[in-house]
Amino acid sequence: MFESTEGRRPPPEVIARLDAMFERVYPASTPESAALLERICSWSRAENQAAGQRLAAIGELDTLRLRQYGERETWWTDTWDSISAEIAAALQISQAQASSYLNYSRAMRNRLPKVGSALVSGDISYSAFQTIVFRTDLIDDAEVMAAVDTALALRVQRWPTMTRGRLAAAVDRVVARADRDAVRRRRKQQASREFSIWDGGDGLSEVHARLFATDAHAVDARLNALAGTACESDPRTLQQRRADAVGAMAAGAERLQCRCGQPNCSAGASPAPGPVVIHVVANQSTVDGAAPDPGAIVGTDVLIPAELVAQLADSSRLRPLVHPGEASPERGYVPSRTLADFVRCRDLTCRFPGCDCPATEADLDHTIPHSQGGPTHASNLKCLCRQHHLIKTFWGWQDQQLPDGTVIWRSPSGQTYVTTPGSALLFPSLCAPTGEIAPPRQRDRVADRTAMMPRRRRTRAENRAKYIADGRRHNRAVRQARQSAQQAASPGPAPPDDPDDGPPPF
């Protein structure tokens, strides 16, 4: 009844009329859409400018602190660490992120001032600036660096929109013309070995690894062997037993604990405890299976569902956590195991602003120093990672601890920051007040303690110089090996020089 139009295309004039009609009804460009895009571009440029101004302000703070203290380059926590701590606390970010800002700030001031000006004016993005800094990091000659900075500042604003990979390649071409040994090169695949863990929100984690083939197959065989140690009545699938065998292998166990529940299980005794310990904090009611409250792995964001906590409790070593209440201070400097366990479980992480170092890897710090009469007491103890412990001790930070574990920090610049124990949301009973303590007899001066600062074996500048030298040495070896291979393959005359491959200035 109807003629088929399959395979037939309407004439161009018909398509044009339809497009025109559709555009009149649903115009693609309107004053409203144009204004919205203008706002998007304006705010993106403002974002770039703000990133540049942030680096500039960090650079001014850096200059101020260097003028006040010098580099303190042999100190274990040097001036760089001290400045990073101030920035991290002020911006509520990690020490590592603050250190990254400081690194790019120094690069903008000392190595790439002209490219940095493009960032401050909003002409390039912060991510583009990061790429340029990384791709030029192996240049070790000041004049070459200045020439590359000039060349990139002229080019980068005219380059079209690029992915990070294409931008890196474009920067590499400029670097190669100035200093072939400074071009970033990909290492061999063996160097990309890695092992990563992503924590999920359901008490499970995902694991990804890139290993030597021999190691990977050894792990595979070991998992199969451990999975086979459970009896035939074990309710888990093979893949579930292999997954559980990872934990048994990490604990150094020789057998996988069977879950058949039979008194005469043929699988043998439970595996012996190993050297690897994962600390999980949970309410007793959760351990007993009588409450839905989750548990928490100390030092992570992982929450363990209540049913999994109860299941783990059947095969784990349990240690009750005792709240000290109004107990008197302990004698001596080192807290008892009971008190130390309480402080670590109350705090869960380092108590410096923005730090998430696990409490199990942190020092126990006397807020009021023991030498000034500070008691070994829950109201005067908190967890600090080694880096922030040294920063507090030697870089002019002041702290006050309240009986509920709250710590009030005052930076060398006078800013105030407040941190609460990590257990405050999950286990508020651990934050019940532990009693008042007497104020310190006197405050000692930071200058009197500087002689006790641990020293570095190599300064930050020496580490950077070695890093650059190693990278350049690798690049030179790769280039020379490639040239030798090309000469061996084609022993004829060398090709003419590329006219664009001259030295700077370009």
Labelled PLM ranges:
Residues 323-344, 353-383, 394-408, 413:
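Histidine-centered nuclease catalytic patch
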Residues 67, 349-352, 390, 397:
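Conserved helix-loop functional segments at active or binding sites
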Residues 196, 206-208, 279-281, 342, ...:
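Structured core elements
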Residues 366, 388-389:
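Histidine-centered divalent metal-coordination motifs
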Residues 260-264, 349-354, 387:
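Short, cysteine/histidine-rich loop/knuckle motifs that typically chelate Zn2+
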Residues 1-332, 417, 431-436, 441-506:
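Rieske [2Fe-2S] iron-sulfur domain-containing proteins
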Residues 391, 404, 431-434:
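Short, well-ordered secondary-structure "scaffold" segments embedded in the functional core
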Residues 421-427:
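A short, sequence-level motif marking secondary-structure junctions
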